[in-house]
Amino acid sequence: MTYVHPVTGRTYPLSEARWCADDGHYLNLAPAPGLRRAQIDATERSVWRYAAALLVDRAHAVSLGEGWTPLVAGEWDGGPVLYKLEFTMPTGSFKDRGMTVMVSYLRSRGIARVLEDSSGNAGASLAAYAAAAGLACRILVPETASYPKIAQIAAGGADVVTIKGSRQDVAEAALAQSTEIFYASHNWQPFFVEGTKTLAYELWEQLGFTAPDNVVVPLGYGSNVLGADRGFEELHRNGEIERRPRIFGVQAAACAPYATAFDAGTDTLVPTRIAPTIAEGIATTRPTRVAEVLHVIRQSGGSIVAVDEAEIVDALGRLARRGLYVEPTSAVAAAGLTRLLASGNIATDETTVLVLTGSGLKASATIGDLLQLAPRQDDR
């Protein structure tokens, strides 16, 4: 197996940890063989139950018990939905699914110090897995990142540095520092997507070894989109599913570069208005794997929708009243599902999975303000 340059086709051996090609372009992993049903390790209750499909020797696994998150049947706008509770991961977000595989690979290749840029969740996840692996860790975060996320990162022993400006400014600062410390970016290092592909394997197993009709996810850089596609593609190639699901990405309208490009019919970013959004976890202006994410969604038969701030707040409150306390970024997907059902793009007789990616515990102060929550005074 090798790294593969998606444009030139040049390959690089996996024996050397890389986050980009020699020309600075991102790299993918060559197609993997995947697994068949009989190869699942049913004794393992983490993503490593699918170790036979992962391109990392299990002997090097750094695990905190991530994965195998609940799939809960519910209702949304009059139709059935399956809530995938990724926010129940060890550090409170889906990022653990990719981080366990990426950190395991990096440690197996002798990497001792790692750098990441993050709005919060990826940083918290890398800090935790780096601590578990015994790696030194530096995390760059935007100065607007919520304090609970910063505290979670720092508690793991990481060196946390705030950067002025946008989420993109933070990414560029990390690139500038990548010459002195290994850039373990979940948006660049393809072993992260090797981990997020286990979302597809879990859904397949939890649904009785079938694929859903639709998967709806918040869309920032696109690691859930790419991971789900990689996993379902492996299952389809191995004859374990008859068809692959449609994948729908949802963005905040205030910061929707993918949605704008999708609507324009291009495979590159086009000029779009950018404004602040409460969905800070997906507020990226220049994602890395643009053509790839757009291709995956189009090929699946899905689409990308953008929702406004009021829709996000409404979905946030509705989810909370169903017992699903998620951060605003997760609520973006639910707001998008409302639009997709109303437009008929998703039908109520289809099996639809709504992926809830991050815990509300990371943003309680913000959620309290958005939903105008306050205790009632007891005047007795």
How would you describe each model-predicted region?
Residues M1-R380:
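PLP-dependent amino-acid enzyme catalytic core
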